[in-house]
Curated annotation (Swiss-Prot):
Pathway in which this enzyme or protein is active: Cofactor biosynthesis; coenzyme A biosynthesis; CoA from (R)-pantothenate: step 4/5
Binding site for ATP: S9, F10, H17, G88, M89, R90, E98, Y123, T124, F125, F126, S127, S128, S129
One Gene Ontology MF term: pantetheine-phosphate adenylyltransferase activity
Function: Reversibly transfers an adenylyl group from ATP to 4'-phosphopantetheine, yielding dephospho-CoA (dPCoA) and pyrophosphate.
Source organism superkingdom: Bacteria
Reactions this protein catalyses: (R)-4'-phosphopantetheine + ATP + H(+) = 3'-dephospho-CoA + diphosphate
A GO CC annotation given for this chain: cytoplasm
A biological process from GO: coenzyme A biosynthetic process
InterPro entries: Cyt_trans-like, PPAT, Rossmann-like_a/b/a_fold
EC number: 2.7.7.3
Keyword Membrane: no
Name of the protein in its database record: Phosphopantetheine adenylyltransferase
Length: 160
């Protein structure tokens, strides 16, 4: 059984994240979307909120599980018995950062493989930060994020 970990902040989770998770779940037996608990990073949603939003948003993906961690990613990957880290790339601009991260992770844990998924074309142009900005200005993000996230963003920004 191959377990893969898809780590991220997921602040908030987007349809692009879910697309990567769904595609990864067709290849791996289990995909754990692991929310990185970053106490030093300014985030819109708390770790508990991000986990809850992810759980609601992945109910339709039976091979996708949700968890949280606050250690080195490779240490977390090993702790859950996984052998693969899943990452997504939207555009060429993501490649350098992902390449550097992969090199660091492979140096720390040569036994863990990194698998990069290219974003589906409809998800290449936006990120979680884009979603937050649009939502903060009162824009419609329902086509970018799952329903539970739309509702959460409306609560945060107090609109509509």
């Amino acid at each position: 059984m191959t377990i893969a970990v898809y780590p991220g902040s997921f602040d908030p989770v987007t349809n692009g994240h879910l697309d990567i998770a769904a595609r990864a779940s067709r290849i791996f037996d289990t995909v754990i979307m692991a929310v990185f608990d970053r106490p030093n990073k300014q985030l819109l949603f708390s770790t508990d909120e991000r986990v809850a939003l992810l759980r609601e948003s992945t109910r339709h993906l039976p091979r996708v599980k949700v968890d949280t961690y606050s250690t080195l990613t490779v240490d977390y990957v090993r702790s859950v018995g996984a052998s693969v880290i899943v990452r997504g790339m939207r555009a060429v601009g993501d490649f350098e950062a992902e390449f550097q991260l992969a090199q660091i992770n492979q140096t720390l844990a040569p036994d863990i493989d990194i698998v990069l998924f290219m974003a589906s074309h409809r998800y290449t142009f936006f990120s979680s930060s884009t979603v937050r900005e649009i939502a903060s200005l009162g824009g419609d993000v329902s086509w970018l994020v799952p329903g539970p996230v739309v509702d959460a963003l409306k609560r945060v920004y107090g609109r509509r």
